[in-house]
């Protein structure tokens, strides 16, 4: 029983089943760096308040640095009997510097505020890492956007041909999604920038501590103003899980289209052999496994979000052991997101854009129909609904002839309302650049969109 820090209250030792079931060390040892960082800050604060002596602080810092080195070098022995990373580090610290000094580190601190601090430090770091990876992915997309302003391809609604656009315009749509993802992470990071350390178990401490100093040392903007909220809050973890879930919503959509566009039915792009796999039985196969795995991993990150929402949904204040289950999903989602963004960016850098196939695909689906309708409204003063009907008839006649409307030689033979000027509209590049609204597919608009994104990433 002497190995259990709370054994003074109990008359019998914990059952071995309980020790194993209760332990979180195999999961939360990921936080060793954050735990040591938080402990050094806490000890520094205690010394500044006269609670620790200078020589005690020096011994604690030196001992914690040795513990960190042992863990990093793989020399540290993790023992499940220590229950969690906090007690494992504290026990080893006391072995190094003696329990008389090592036992003073936990003054004015509970594991409740300690773990919340460790967890927040990890979450804050993860925000910054993900923002960097998203920035790199946006930059890759911008490089394509600069080169392919005149690479014409079909756009789709309901997976049916809609209107001609450029590949630049298409890839910029995803770049703007990622820009919102960055902003979402920035907003969540700001909300997470409040330190729980010093909240203790749930009601603060009777020691005259300086929480603001701890916040300054650890790089937090401010402290959590309510101790009970400080140890109970896991919004910061939920926010990160949600942000990652939305990132995967966007990357999964992109990957789905990369899968479609690289198929024989489309052949708009070719994925590099370096990022493709083959079949164990079919020699001809070239599979887009990177995209399929990212699409599949989306379910995992969604599940991690739902899991933590469910854990937190009915917990009474303040800390509950249920919250021990908050970390595994975060660790998994963060690693999954980082790995996926890195390989997605690497894969995208090596795709081949098949311009001719994209252009040929525009000759299907009557994609210039809207341009003809707009022409009738603009030049002939015909109400749009009537123009819609007239052009619908043109499409029907083209269908009968087995051609696309872009291949019609004389529109006036179908309806006399069309003149020779209308024939000029049957051109994909003209259609693309005729758009005048902000945010449209025209080259001028695309260039503005590129400038917006470049300005954004330059300020990150």
Curated annotation (Swiss-Prot):
A Pfam family annotated for this UniProt entry: ASL_C2
HAMAP family assigned: Arg_succ_lyase (MF_00006)
Superkingdom in the source lineage: Bacteria
Compartment(s) where it occurs, according to its Swiss-Prot or TrEMBL record: Cytoplasm
Enzyme Commission numbers on file: 4.3.2.1
InterPro entries: Arg_succ_lyase_C (IPR029419), Argininosuccinate_lyase (IPR009049), Fumarase/histidase_N (IPR024083), Fumarate_lyase_CS (IPR020557), Fumarate_lyase_fam (IPR000362), Fumarate_lyase_N (IPR022761), L-Aspartase-like (IPR008948)
Organism annotation: Campylobacter jejuni subsp. jejuni serotype O:23/36 (strain 81-176)
Enzyme class: lyase
Family as reported in the entry's similarity comment: Belongs to the lyase 1 family. Argininosuccinate lyase subfamily.
GO BP term (any one): arginine biosynthetic process via ornithine
Name assigned to this protein: Argininosuccinate lyase
UniProt keywords, alphabetically: Amino-acid biosynthesis, Arginine biosynthesis, Cytoplasm, Lyase
Keyword match Glycoprotein: no
GO molecular function ontology, one term from the record: argininosuccinate lyase activity
UniProt catalytic activity: 2-(N(omega)-L-arginino)succinate = fumarate + L-arginine
Keyword Plastid: no
One cellular component term from this protein's GO annotations in UniProt: cytosol
Pathway given in the UniProt record: Amino-acid biosynthesis; L-arginine biosynthesis; L-arginine from L-ornithine and carbamoyl phosphate: step 3/3
